[in-house]
């Protein structure tokens, strides 16, 4: 496995992954992001992307997307550690992210890695669906309704 910082040449491959989810935009807290506008960490194995973390730094570090295609190998944890190193080097005071109430794997994953719930935005997904109608309504048999903000102080 190789962890590398995303460069311009990676944008097409990353955009194709995101388009596979129905659209080439990522919506969080009512804001739209495009992969090519975000910094990131890519994980390659035998020339294939098996994980990625996209983030933006604006005083604090926001993890906009974290995805691994091979589970239970520590890839997501290692991506977070790489992003934490970058955030520290940029003097960020915290790392934060948004997930949904129905993403039960993420809810446990982030708490096990030291993140704390800092906000719950009730019914926020309705606003996000106005921007990106492709967002599903259900996940894990749970209505996708609320956005949950996690943070970690640096």
Task: Describe each PLM feature range.
Residues 1-9, 148, 153-154:
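Conserved N-terminal entry element of GNAT/NAT acetyltransferase domains
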Residues 5-71, 77-80:
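Acetyl-CoA-dependent GNAT
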Residues 25-35, 46, 52-54, 119-147:
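Conserved acyl-donor/pantetheine-binding loop and adjacent beta-alpha core of acyl/acetyltransferases
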Residues 87-99:
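Conserved GNAT acetyl-CoA-binding A-motif
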Residues 97-106, 122-129:
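Conserved beta-strand-loop-alpha-helix junction that forms the acyl-donor binding cleft
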Residues 110, 115:
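Conserved active-site tyrosine of GNAT-family acetyltransferases
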